Structure formats: C-alpha cells, structure tokens
C-alpha cells in the first residue's frame, strides 16, 4: 500500500501536517496514527491466524485461486487476450504478421496502385434499381 511512498512524499506530508495541525499537535497526531496502524496490523494478523486454524489445510487450497485472481488483477484487456486466447503470440494485435523466418531477406512491399481516374464532369449516373 505504501510501497510507492518516497522520501519526497514523506517530507511533503510532514510539511502539510505542520501547516494544518501546527507544531504542538503534530507529534500527538503521528503517535495516534502509528498506534492505529499497529492495531489494524495486529487485528489483521489475528484474523489470518484464526482463519488458518479454522480452515486447516483448506486454507492453502483457498490461497491458490486468490493468488491467480491477484495475477489477473493487473492485466490489461490486451494482455489477457494475448495470454489466454492467443497463447502469448501478440502478432495478431500488433500487426507484425509477416516476419522473415530463418534470416530470409524481407521482400519490399508492392508498389501502391495508381489512383483511379477522377469522374468526368457531366450528368450523374442514375440507377433505377437503386431507388
């Protein structure tokens, strides 16, 4: 949760705390916050221990699907398609279909067809079946 909290962010939080709470109340607020976090951590570890005792070996069986869900959580739709439907081959999505195989020389793309001749001015063609 706080893994991306850098020293710069901590410094900004301390400065904001000094401005908002003042130097008299800031140490008490820090103490209260650290105690609340410690109590929450103790509560969560107690719940985990109790679940482990109640479920026994089934607890490990429960962890396997949860870890798979955690892996899927950060996947983008493109990564999910690539992994599950395309077996990791994303050439369908990137458009890199024709890669040279075994060092074969790549052929240059064909020259584009000349543009069609513009329509001659005059009466617009009429199609009785189309109307």
Swiss-Prot record:
It is found in: Cell membrane. Residues 96-131 are annotated as: Disordered. One of its GO terms (molecular function) is protein transmembrane transporter activity. It is a single-pass membrane protein. Keywords: Cell membrane, Membrane, Protein transport, Translocation, Transmembrane, Transmembrane helix, Transport. Residues 107-116 have a biased composition (Pro residues). Pfam families: TatA_B_E. Its main location: membrane. It comes from the Bacteria. The chain crosses the membrane at residues 2-22. GO terms for biological process: protein transport by the Tat complex. The Tat system comprises two distinct complexes: a TatABC complex, containing multiple copies of TatA, TatB and TatC subunits, and a separate TatA complex, containing only TatA subunits. Substrates initially bind to the TatABC complex, which probably triggers association of the separate TatA complex to form the active translocon. Part of the twin-arginine translocation (Tat) system that transports large folded proteins containing a characteristic twin-arginine motif in their signal peptide across membranes. Together with TatC, TatB is part of a receptor directly interacting with Tat signal peptides. TatB may form an oligomeric binding site that transiently accommodates folded Tat precursor proteins before their translocation. Belongs to the TatB family. This is Sec-independent protein translocase protein TatB. It comes from Mycobacterium avium (strain 104). The lineage of its organism: Bacteria, Bacillati, Actinomycetota, Actinomycetes, Mycobacteriales. The gene is tatB.
């Amino acid at each position: 949760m706080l893994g991306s909290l850098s020293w710069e962010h901590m410094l900004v939080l301390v400065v904001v705390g000094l401005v908002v709470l003042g130097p008299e109340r800031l140490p008490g607020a820090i103490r209260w916050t650290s105690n609340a976090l410690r109590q929450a951590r103790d509560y969560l570890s107690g719940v985990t221990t109790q679940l482990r005792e109640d479920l026994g070996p089934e607890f490990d069986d429960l962890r396997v699907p949860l870890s798979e869900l955690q892996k899927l959580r950060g996947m983008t739709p493109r990564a999910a398609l690539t992994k599950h439907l395309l077996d990791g081959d994303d050439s369908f999505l990137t458009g890199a279909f024709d890669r040279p195989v075994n060092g074969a020389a790549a052929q240059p793309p064909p020259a584009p067809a000349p543009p069609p001749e513009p329509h001659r001015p005059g009466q617009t063609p009429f199609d009785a079946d189309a109307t």
